[in-house]
Amino acid sequence: MSVKSILTEPNKLLRQISKPVENVGDEERRLMDDMLDTMYAAPGIGLAAIQIGVPKRIIVMDISRDEDKKEPRYFVNPVIKNKNDITSKYEEGCLSVPDQFAEIERPNECEVEYLDYNGKKQLLKADGLLATCIQHEMDHLEGVLFIDYLSKLKKSMIIKKLSKIKSNRIIV
């Protein structure tokens, strides 16, 4: 298991649509382990495979917020089967959009079908932060970032700021 580099906006790979996983095998489990290590090291509560440059429909998350009681979740080929009409707002951030946060409104409940770490089909009814995190990470699988829900002006300002930060980096 190893910590990988996280891609940051602007990066064309982040706008790519991820491809379904044919089979959950050792390679996919190693990827999920690396994703989880990367997410914890960042630190964050969710990560999509595309954020480390792998265009597969895989997301990992852990919303437990307790260092001693980690509760990792693995979603392969997740599909939202149902969403609630009632929405809630959470201030979202993203490891691929560093140090930027915005209040985003999403359905406060969703039902998601997916394959787990071992390739077994699962159905989960999620609400609150878990539902928000699932929807946020699943957006990555479609090439969508949380900043895409903002006004054009706000989004443009964030991208300019991130581009400037990237161009000022010195790699030694």
UniProtKB/Swiss-Prot annotation:
This is Peptide deformylase. Keywords: Hydrolase, Iron, Metal-binding, Protein biosynthesis. It comes from Pelagibacter ubique (strain HTCC1062). GO terms for biological process: co-translational protein modification; translation. InterPro entries: Peptide_deformylase, Peptide_deformylase_sf. The keyword Ligase does not apply. The active site is at residue 137. It catalyses: N-terminal N-formyl-L-methionyl-[peptide] + H2O = N-terminal L-methionyl-[peptide] + formate.
